[in-house]
């Protein structure tokens, strides 16, 4: 039929699952469904607790909160398929739309979830990291080298400083997100005993092509949207992504249009997914940045 409709819950669930599988950030972030735009309280610092004596006063907590607006940015994918393809190949139209739309929307969202500037797009993981007063802790290393890391421009000590700059309470469950190029160079770094920082996982040691290993004991994820090494670039983030939250507003909508491209015997399908995202606790993330020169 020609017109827009909200997909059934079963299809919606499969679309969200496909998005999660196709998006690096979505696969590790917290996700929440919300029916409308809203303001949410963001905790700027964890409160403290102390033992008090009987009859003693309880001092005020140092926890502070701000409010951030959660909007809904409309991600749309237009899929065009020939009737011959759908008819002759016996393709399940529902599966075809889910796969194609999910992959297209996931690519767009993954880019914005990484470096979105909160202006017409979600607030990315690294938004504010390059500000004069960074919103998240930044460890600087290197000399702007765009090809490799050496003892002259990036040492094991700097990588250790970066990882351990994340407060200990957030390290459990934390992961590293970086680019393939940076990972290659991080894997070449050795400690003074000659051991690589990168260690293969037990399964990878047993089976070729096993799951990825770790950097300093922490899992890593590769995103094509992380910058390669260059001056003043954020090239990796280590953090607890339970504190990066994706808000999906409402259900996915699909418009099936068999008429606009009827002269070429094609069907158009437009899929719309509304989402926003932001860091809910800045101190749960630390960035690794190439120096200016």
Please annotate each region the language model reported.
Residues 1-173, 187, 193-214, 220-221, ...:
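Acidic/polar, low-complexity extended loops/arms that serve as protein-protein interfaces
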Residues 213-256:
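C-terminal hydrophobic structural anchor segments
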Residues 99-101, 266-271:
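Active-site scaffold segments
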Residues 51-53, 90-92, 187-191, 229-234, ...:
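Short conserved micro-motifs at the rims of enzyme active sites and ligand-binding pockets
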Residues 172, 216, 250, 263-267:
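A short pocket-lining beta-strand/turn micro-motif at the edge of beta-sheets
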Residues 176-179, 220, 269:
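Hydrophobic, well-ordered secondary-structure elements that form the walls
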Residues 1-4, 287-293:
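Intrinsically disordered, low-complexity terminal tails
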Residues 256-262, 275-277:
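Short proline/glycine-enriched turn/loop segments at secondary-structure junctions
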């Amino acid at each position: 039929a020609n017109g827009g409709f909200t997909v059934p819950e079963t299809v919606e669930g499969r679309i969200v699952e496909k998005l999660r599988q196709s998006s690096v950030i979505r696969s590790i972030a917290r996700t929440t469904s919300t029916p409308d735009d809203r303001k949410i309280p963001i905790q700027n610092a964890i409160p403290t607790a102390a033992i008090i004596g009987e009859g003693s006063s309880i001092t005020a907590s140092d926890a502070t909160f701000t409010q951030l607006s959660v909007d809904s940015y409309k991600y749309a994918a237009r899929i065009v398929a020939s009737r011959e393809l759908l008819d002759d190949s016996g393709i399940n139209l529902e599966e075809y739309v889910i796969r194609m739309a999910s992959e297209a929307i996931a690519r767009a969202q993954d880019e914005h979830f990484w470096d979105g500037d909160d202006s017409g797009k979600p607030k990315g993981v690294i938004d504010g990291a390059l500000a004069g007063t960074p919103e998240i802790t930044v460890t600087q290393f290197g000399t702007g080298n765009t090809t490799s890391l050496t003892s002259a421009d990036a040492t094991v000590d700097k990588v250790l400083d970066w990882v351990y700059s994340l407060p200990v309470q957030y390290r459990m469950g934390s992961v590293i997100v970086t680019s393939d190029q940076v990972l290659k160079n991080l894997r070449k770094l050795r400690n003074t005993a000659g051991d690589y920082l990168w260690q293969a996982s037990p399964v990878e040691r047993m089976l070729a092509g096993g799951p990825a290993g770790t950097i300093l004991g922490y899992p890593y994820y590769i995103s094509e949207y992380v910058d390669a090494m260059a001056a003043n670039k954020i090239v990796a983030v280590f953090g607890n992504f339970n504190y990066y939250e994706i808000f999906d507003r409402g259900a996915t909508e699909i418009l099936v249009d068999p008429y606009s491209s009827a002269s070429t015997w094609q069907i158009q399908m437009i899929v719309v997914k509304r989402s926003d995202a932001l860091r809910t606790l800045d101190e749960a993330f630390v960035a690794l940045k190439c120096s200016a020169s």
